[in-house]
Amino acid sequence: MSRALSQRARRTYFNNPLVEESLRYLPAAVEHPTSSAFRAYLIAQLPQSSVQTRQRFAEYISQRFSQDGQMNLALARALARYGDSRTGREILYFEMLQASPVLQEIASLWLAELPPEGSSRDSLLAFLERRLGGRDSDRVATAAVATFRRCRKISSPKPAVYIPVWSEPSPEAFFYVLARLYPERAMVRVEQLAGQPLLRAMLWPRPCLPGMLEAARRAGHVSKISELDQYHQFTLADSAEVRLGRLFGEPSSPPPSPTPEPEARKDPVPPKPVKKRKPAAGAPRKSKRKGRAEPVQLPLLPQDK
């Protein structure tokens, strides 16, 4: 039986990034939404000949991209849409940072702080030893560098020298990250967004954010961008689920209209009796027959004696 990773293990250990396998197989999590069902699917589908290797890789992927036994379906839908493309790799990289705090720390506090000429593997090992106390530093460094290479976040002009690759994301990758960082409709300051450690770990140049937000406004993910005095802020248009559905081109179904409650049965109200006015003395009375007036008995005149 599989054993879930502890919070400490998630924070201090990272191994076997399996980027290519994740890109290829994670879209199937839409049909296998629980971690146990997806793990069984991976064991049957992974190409490795050894059953033990398939089980181990299936465990890594299913645990990395699940929470409380449920797979990350936003990621699965994104990879079903974008696959092995620049956008797909950028989205997968973001979710790997989310899933592995130690990888996020390496990216935001070591890789993003490197000078333009880069640095050596020794500096990465020194960084990890201060955080991990020497435990598995070499293995974690190897896995982190492999992830950065696969997700195109570093270049190596010569062995064991790493240069960070800062690049503006595709609009689709930015819209996805915006939805995952802010799941509810809200007003957000641009400074708050720019200060997110995750955004720094993505190696997105800070000057690109205003243009990305304007693209989000045109695409309907942001409803308003405003600059008030010293505040530069934007308002998200909808919930994350609505924005992701729009991003993936999924048909949006209107919410079902509430079923009207049956009205209580009411007894018919009898009409109020109409009080007839008495005709004035001497006025001709209407006949009950239509079109005829009923003669009126006039008082007799006195007779001459």
Located regions from the model:
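Eukaryotic partner-binding/assembly regions in large regulatory complexes
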Residues: 1-102, 106-112, 118-119
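Glycine-rich, aromatic-bearing surface loops/beta-hairpins
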Residues: 4-23, 232-234, 243-256
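Short acidic, hydrophobic short linear motifs in intrinsically disordered regions
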Residues: 38-39, 116-130, 187-200
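Short amphipathic alpha-helical interaction segments
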Residues: 52-56, 135-147, 203-215
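Short, basic alpha-helical nucleic acid-contact segments in DNA-binding proteins
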Residues: 64-68, 144-155, 219-223
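Long, low-complexity, charge-rich intrinsically disordered regions
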Residues: 75, 236-305
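Eukaryote-skewed repeat-based solenoidal scaffolds used as protein-protein interaction platforms
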Residues: 107-166
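Accessory, usually C-terminal, subdomains that scaffold auxiliary metal cofactors
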Residues: 157-247
